[in-house]
């Protein structure tokens, strides 16, 4: 385990890292994947450890990957105690302040890009849906580095969808409990964001605010999804801006999940929308 402090020597301290022997390079905003504001309590620490362990189980191979974690000082102190025996491919970065972790991770990625430190075999994972990662995601794509965003449902900035090459949802419990695949969750997520829904995935699924049905058609045809929206605010489905956003769905699914799809969106408030 390595501890790198956010001081004037920060850039010099990280510029000597070498990613040649690593496959995935993870940039984890721990507070973002927890989904709650940091708080000094036993419950918060248990939640934080659970979410980070779950992230690592699903996405990290510590024999092949390098992991950067940025968070509030008191959170990093807890991680130091738990992972002190971890080899030097886990880098902890303590930083206080609003959006401090995101800003420092973005700074780190930019430093690595500017100094040509990524290799073509590296795969960059960003565990945050914050929009400030959009410029580095675009920059990574321009130099041929694969990227994936791992984030919470309805917590992904709209600009991220077009910037990253893949999106995976970090709602591990709901994905398992409701047997949801990433494309189904993406459709619910993207439509929720387009309609300004402020709901968690569990609410959307349990209350059937948005339902998604996958039709098993002939394998030579595009996969067809039927999306039903229970209700919308202020007839948003009739808005040109919303329609323009929804029209991007097939292209985004092809980019993010390598699947050609057609979508029919149904709602009592408007005519069917065919994408």
Question: What kind of feature is each model-predicted range?
Answer:
Residues 30-32, 203-207, 215-232:
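Short glycine-rich, basic-tinged beta-strand/loop micro-motifs
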Residues 2-101, 141-142, 146, 151:
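Domain-level signal for Mg2+-assisted phosphodiester chemistry and nucleotide/NA-binding surfaces
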């Amino acid at each position: 385990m390595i501890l790198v402090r956010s001081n004037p020597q920060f850039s010099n301290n990280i510029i000597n890292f070498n990613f040649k022997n690593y496959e995935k390079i993870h940039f984890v905003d721990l507070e973002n994947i927890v989904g709650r504001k940091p708080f000094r309590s036993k419950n918060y620490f248990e939640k934080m450890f659970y979410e980070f362990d779950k992230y690592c189980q699903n996405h990290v191979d510590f024999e092949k990957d390098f992991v950067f974690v940025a968070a509030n000082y008191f959170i990093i102190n807890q991680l130091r105690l738990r992972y002190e025996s971890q080899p030097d491919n886990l880098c902890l970065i303590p930083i206080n302040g609003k959006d401090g972790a995101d800003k420092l991770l973005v700074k780190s990625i930019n430093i690595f890009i500017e100094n040509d430190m990524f290799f073509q075999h590296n795969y960059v994972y960003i565990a945050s849906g914050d929009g400030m990662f959009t410029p580095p995601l675009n920059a990574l794509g321009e130099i041929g580095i694969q990227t994936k965003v791992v984030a919470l449902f309805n917590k992904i900035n709209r600009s991220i969808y077009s910037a990253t090459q893949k999106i995976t949802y970090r709602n591990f419990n709901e994905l398992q409990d409701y047997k949801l695949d990433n494309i189904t969750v993406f459709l619910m997520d993207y439509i929720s964001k387009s309609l300004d829904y402020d709901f968690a995935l569990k609410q959307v699924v349990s209350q059937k605010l948005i339902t998604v049905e996958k039709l098993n058609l002939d394998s030579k045809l595009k996969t067809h999804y039927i999306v039903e929206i229970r209700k919308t605010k202020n007839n948003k489905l009739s808005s040109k801006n919303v329609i323009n956003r929804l029209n991007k769905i097939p292209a985004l699914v092809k980019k993010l999940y390598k699947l050609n799809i057609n979508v029919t969106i149904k709602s009592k408030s408007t005519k069917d929308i065919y994408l």
